Amino acid sequence: MKTVLFLLFYIPFNLLAQFTDDFSDGDFLVSPIWFGDVASFEVDPDYILHLNDSVASTSSLFTSSNALMNGEWIFDVRLEFSPSTNNYAKVYLVTNSTDLLNTEGVYVKIGGQSGSVDDLSLYKQTGTNHTQIIDGTDGLLTNNPDIKVKVTRDDVGNWELFLDTNGVFFSEGTAFDNSIIQSDYFGIYCKYTITRSDKFWFDNFLVNGTVLSLLEYKKSKRILKIIDVTSRESRLKNQPLFYIYDDGTVEKKITID
């Protein structure tokens, strides 16, 4: 009897990944669980997630989310000030780390420009590099933005950014990018001066999508686990025990002597 050790490569399949939170339970620590700079946030009397700090800083919250393929992300943001380079928000649709200084992800940036050109834009982050992939209409978020945002991504990497300021979504642009292939978290990020430290609100998060597709998986093969295979006794020698395939072609053949 022979015992053969081989490596089992991950076989891609799609898993539904979704969550919603309107904070109607008055809490952001359960169902779903948000974590991060929890001392800087509260759910206010109107059941809206509210930044409630008292010093100039940056604060973030995260919740688990694997949604990426065929994804849809919807949320509300209200900023009671005119955004600037020192006062703005980012919503991370996709990130593989809670260290936002060095992560791989995709985020929506609300404001953050100098002058009167603040807009809604979509960015890709790779490590410490930030690349704008959809540039929204300049000037739409110049004064006290109170908006609903929607972002979609299909199964091959086509993104679209939508903005609703008066009850109707309209497109802010499209882009193709399939370089980000993994999500572990959804998150919000606030940068603020002391006078804006309690003037950020977020609500009505709705996230849908699937975890993985074969197309994106091809970029990141990985070993899932090692399995022992015990064969039955056989009089045949030098016959293939099994094959490992890659995209339909034989990659490796294992035989028993």
State where each predicted segment sits.
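Flexible glycan-contacting loops in extracellular carbohydrate-active proteins
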Residues: 87, 172-201
